[in-house]
């Protein structure tokens, strides 16, 4: 069994200060982000992701939404692009070419959530992930798609799962058949479990247990005490993670851990 490298980060002091100091100072060098999400019954996740990414300091963002949302979203966001949707208002398979083009443009992409449950959308999302070489951060109900279709994680680029502990339980139970993960684990047990899940899924994991935020990547795990119980943590963390990965693609573990610190600092400033 591979050993685990464990880093504890204080909410007042970054574990990787050099990364914080080297953050780009201009929009031109701050990365390009593609945000994907929404359906006729929900649009909050992609719009909130856009807002958080702007606060995090991303250079340029595009928000890809189903065309069925244009009449609503057009009044709320001016950077939206609208791709083919199904009759029920979810993403259609016909959107693949446009999404792949936008993913190629981007330094990272966040599949923010509010996709709804649609079989055609599931096919589209799997095709997008498998054919794109852009780092992808998955959140909200996108994690449920992955748990149902774990082959979505079989890709050449980095995949980051920003998942609740209950979603990780479902993922473990339905797909990777790892030892059970539970809410009553102590920190040492959870660190080992997250390391194993990350390696088994060939993805990075960000999750929350009580007020602790964990990052797991290729045998490395960090833990940061947020000292808050933020209900928006998934969308917010995914947005900050995507921004930091866009700017620091060669240092994923440090970037994701620093994204946690950065998001908590921004929360204090609000």
Label for each model-derived stretch:
Residues 143, 167-172:
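A generic structural signal for short hydrophobic patches within well-formed alpha-helices
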Residues 132-138, 156-159, 202-203:
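A short helix->loop->beta-strand "cap" motif at the edges of active sites that frequently abuts
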Residues 130-149:
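Short, acidic/small-residue loops that bind anionic groups at enzyme active sites
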Residues 107, 164-165:
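Short loop/turn segments at strand-loop or loop-helix junctions that form parts
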Residues 157-158, 166-168:
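PIN/NYN-family metal-dependent endoribonuclease catalytic core
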Residues 1-126, 151-157, 172-270:
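Small-residue (G/A/S/T)-rich helix-start motifs and N-terminal tracts that mark the onset
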Residues 60-66, 137-140, 161-164:
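Short internal beta-strands
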């Amino acid at each position: 069994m591979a050993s685990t490298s464990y880093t504890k980060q204080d909410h007042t002091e970054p574990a990787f200060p050099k990364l914080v100091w080297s953050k780009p100072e201009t929009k031109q060098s701050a990365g390009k982000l593609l945000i994907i999400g929404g359906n006729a019954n929900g649009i909050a996740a992609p719009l909130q992701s856009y807002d958080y990414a702007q606060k995090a300091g991303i250079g340029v963002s595009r928000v890809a939404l189903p065309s069925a949302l244009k009449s609503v979203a057009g009044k709320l966001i001016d950077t939206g692009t609208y791709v083919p949707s199904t009759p029920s208002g979810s993403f259609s398979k016909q959107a693949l070419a446009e999404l792949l083009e936008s993913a190629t443009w981007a330094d990272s992409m966040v599949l923010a959530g509010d996709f709804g449950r649609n079989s055609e959308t599931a096919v589209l999302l799997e095709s997008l992930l498998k054919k794109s070489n852009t780092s992808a951060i998955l959140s909200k109900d996108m994690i449920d798609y992955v748990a149902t279709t774990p082959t979505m994680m079989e890709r050449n680029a980095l995949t980051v799962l920003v998942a609740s502990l209950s979603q990780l339980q479902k993922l473990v139970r339905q797909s990777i058949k790892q030892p059970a993960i539970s809410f009553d684990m102590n920190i040492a047990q959870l660190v080992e479990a997250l390391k194993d899940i990350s390696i088994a899924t060939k993805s990075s994991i960000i999750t929350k247990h009580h007020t602790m935020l964990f990052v797991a990547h290729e045998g490395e795990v960090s833990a940061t005490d947020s000292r808050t119980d933020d209900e928006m943590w998934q969308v917010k963390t995914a947005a900050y993670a995507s921004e930091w990965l866009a700017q620091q693609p060669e240092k994923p573990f440090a970037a994701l851990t620093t994204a946690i610190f950065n998001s908590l600092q921004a929360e204090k400033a609000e």
